[in-house]
């Protein structure tokens, strides 16, 4: 697939509202039109046919991505990841199977979004507000010396960092939460059927996955490992992670960072993905 088509399909440019309006403006295909385009791609390698198939299904990706709101992840990034899944589905779609592309593509779209959420939610939910980010980068040093805080220590830390006692307690709890596997485990099934596996939460708007993790409150040193791993990244990767997830409330978009570094948005996405992979490996080590 051409670079131009990848840019158009993968990276929502400008405002999200404008992107969604543009996606909805592309006409939906009839079954006959879809099959003709799919045959041109499948048998002739027609990239223009692939482009038309992708553009006509962008609205579907945006609709699916909305079901994964509530994780502190940018909606544009969720759509971008879903679009990657759509492109994979289009590349693998066989018109002779006898199903519509939308039915075939839904698995690929959701799989990419699932992977993205699970790769990033932990880092986002540890520090989602400015006060929590301040705590995240300072609290671990105090905890290494004192361990779990009593109430007097909580109040002391709160005064020193200029936050509330509630903020300190919440961050202490978040820093103790450990990561989860995607699918239910035998241990989950043994706990009165109350599984915390993300596969049961990701697309359920009535459930707050992060809140469930915090309530379960499994102790872990994941936050310490994350902070140390951040220090081990190169300067550009550190800046990308902080600008995208950990800095001020106005998080940078892929395009903004691309303009800053003089590279493509796709290149920034690759750097971000590699940095996230290193952080995840450090957390799981």
Swiss-Prot record:
<dbReference type="InterPro" id="IPR013324">
    <property type="entry name" value="RNA_pol_sigma_r3/r4-like"/>
</dbReference>
<dbReference type="InterPro" id="IPR007627">
    <property type="entry name" value="RNA_pol_sigma70_r2"/>
</dbReference>
<dbReference type="GO" id="GO:0016987">
    <property type="term" value="F:sigma factor activity"/>
</dbReference>
<dbReference type="InterPro" id="IPR050813">
    <property type="entry name" value="Sigma-70_Factor"/>
</dbReference>
<dbReference type="InterPro" id="IPR014284">
    <property type="entry name" value="RNA_pol_sigma-70_dom"/>
</dbReference>
<comment type="subunit">
    <text>Interacts with the RNA polymerase core enzyme.</text>
</comment>
<dbReference type="GO" id="GO:0003677">
    <property type="term" value="F:DNA binding"/>
</dbReference>
<dbReference type="GO" id="GO:0009408">
    <property type="term" value="P:response to heat"/>
</dbReference>
<dbReference type="GO" id="GO:0005737">
    <property type="term" value="C:cytoplasm"/>
</dbReference>
<dbReference type="Pfam" id="PF04545">
    <property type="entry name" value="Sigma70_r4"/>
</dbReference>
<keyword id="KW-0805">Transcription regulation</keyword>
<feature type="short sequence motif" description="Interaction with polymerase core subunit RpoC">
    <location>
        <begin position="77"/>
        <end position="80"/>
    </location>
</feature>
<dbReference type="Pfam" id="PF04542">
    <property type="entry name" value="Sigma70_r2"/>
</dbReference>
<dbReference type="GO" id="GO:0006352">
    <property type="term" value="P:DNA-templated transcription initiation"/>
</dbReference>
<dbReference type="InterPro" id="IPR036388">
    <property type="entry name" value="WH-like_DNA-bd_sf"/>
</dbReference>
<keyword id="KW-0963">Cytoplasm</keyword>
<dbReference type="InterPro" id="IPR013325">
    <property type="entry name" value="RNA_pol_sigma_r2"/>
</dbReference>
<protein>
    <recommendedName>
        <fullName>RNA polymerase sigma factor RpoH</fullName>
    </recommendedName>
</protein>
<keyword id="KW-0731">Sigma factor</keyword>
<keyword id="KW-0346">Stress response</keyword>
<dbReference type="Pfam" id="PF00140">
    <property type="entry name" value="Sigma70_r1_2"/>
</dbReference>
<comment type="similarity">
    <text>Belongs to the sigma-70 factor family. RpoH subfamily.</text>
</comment>
<keyword id="KW-0804">Transcription</keyword>
<keyword id="KW-0238">DNA-binding</keyword>
<comment type="function">
    <text>Sigma factors are initiation factors that promote the attachment of RNA polymerase to specific initiation sites and are then released. This sigma factor is involved in regulation of expression of heat shock genes.</text>
</comment>
<dbReference type="InterPro" id="IPR012759">
    <property type="entry name" value="RNA_pol_sigma_RpoH_proteobac"/>
</dbReference>
<dbReference type="InterPro" id="IPR007630">
    <property type="entry name" value="RNA_pol_sigma70_r4"/>
</dbReference>
<dbReference type="InterPro" id="IPR000943">
    <property type="entry name" value="RNA_pol_sigma70"/>
</dbReference>
<feature type="region of interest" description="Sigma-70 factor domain-4">
    <location>
        <begin position="229"/>
        <end position="281"/>
    </location>
</feature>
<feature type="DNA-binding region" description="H-T-H motif">
    <location>
        <begin position="254"/>
        <end position="273"/>
    </location>
</feature>
<feature type="region of interest" description="Sigma-70 factor domain-2">
    <location>
        <begin position="53"/>
        <end position="122"/>
    </location>
</feature>
<dbReference type="InterPro" id="IPR009042">
    <property type="entry name" value="RNA_pol_sigma70_r1_2"/>
</dbReference>
């Amino acid at each position: 697939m051409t670079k131009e088509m990848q840019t158009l399909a993968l990276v929502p440019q400008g405002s999200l509202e404008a992107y969604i309006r543009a996606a909805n403006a592309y006409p939906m295909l009839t079954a006959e039109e879809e099959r003709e385009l799919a045959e041109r791609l499948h048998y002739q390698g027609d990239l223009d046919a692939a482009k038309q198939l992708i553009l006509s299904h962008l609205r579907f990706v945006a609709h699916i991505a909305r079901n994964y709101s509530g994780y502190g992840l940018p909606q544009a990034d969720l759509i971008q990841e879903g679009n990657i899944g759509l492109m994979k589905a289009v590349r693998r779609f066989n018109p002779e199977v006898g199903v519509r592309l939308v039915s075939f593509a839904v698995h690929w779209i959701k799989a990419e979004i699932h992977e993205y959420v699970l790769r990033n939610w932990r880092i986002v939910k540890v520090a989602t507000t400015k006060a929590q980010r301040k705590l995240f980068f300072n609290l671990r040093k105090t905890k290494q010396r004192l361990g779990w805080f009593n109430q007097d220590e909580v109040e002391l830390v709160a005064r020193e960092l200029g936050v509330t006692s509630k903020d300190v307690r919440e961050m202490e709890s978040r820093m103790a939460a450990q990561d989860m596997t995607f699918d239910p485990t035998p241990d989950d099934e043994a706990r009165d059927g109350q599984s915390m596996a993300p596969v049961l939460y990701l697309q359920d708007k009535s459930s707050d996955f992060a809140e469930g993790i915090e309530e379960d409150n499994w102790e872990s040193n994941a936050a310490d490992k994350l902070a140390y791993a951040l220090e081990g990244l190169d300067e550009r990767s550190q800046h990308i992670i902080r600008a995208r997830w950990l800095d001020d409330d106005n998080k940078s978009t892929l395009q903004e960072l691309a303009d800053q570094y003089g590279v493509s948005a796709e290149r920034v996405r690759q750097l971000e993905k590699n940095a996230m992979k290193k952080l995840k490996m450090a957390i799981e080590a």
